[in-house]
Amino acid sequence: MTIAALIITYNEERNIERCIRSVLSFADEIIVLDSFSTDRTADICRSQGVNFIQRKWEGYSAAKNYLNEQCSSDYIFSIDADEAPNKEMQDHLVELKSGQMNGVYSVNRITNYCGKWIRHSGWFPDVKIRLFPRGS
């Protein structure tokens, strides 16, 4: 099974390199869709050797759907530019690839707000579907 990491960006020069590096161990293809950032996002992405596409912003769902159409992998790992899976999750995804992947996978996301991890008030776990078959 193959996995594509799909990332949407706009002015993410502070985050995008960390995000890209965090998916290298398990992603067979990395595609970044950028809405014509005015910072160094494009330069950073190109230096990382990812498939970098610039396109006018037409909304979140339209961007995600467009990205899904651009990849050729069996599974899609959808990640935000300011996110990065930790080592444990990276290792789990590598292991998952070597076995039988079946269905949709979710992650428990933890939010960092103003430098503090939010673990209360219904903010954690923030369950998000992040890995799913292409075309689903």
Where are these regions (language model features)?
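N-proximal low-complexity "stem/linker" segments adjacent to membrane-targeting elements
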Residues: 1-22
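Acidic helix N-cap motif at the loop->helix transition within catalytic regions
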Residues: 17, 39-48, 88-89
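Short, acidic, metal-binding catalytic loop of nucleotide-sugar glycosyltransferases
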Residues: 21-30
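A conserved acidic beta->alpha catalytic loop
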Residues: 22, 34-43, 80
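Short, structured coil segments at secondary-structure junctions
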Residues: 26, 48-49, 127
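Conserved donor nucleotide-binding strand/loop of the catalytic core
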Residues: 42-70
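Catalytic-site signature of metal-activated, phosphate-bearing donor transferases
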Residues: 61-68, 74-79, 86-136
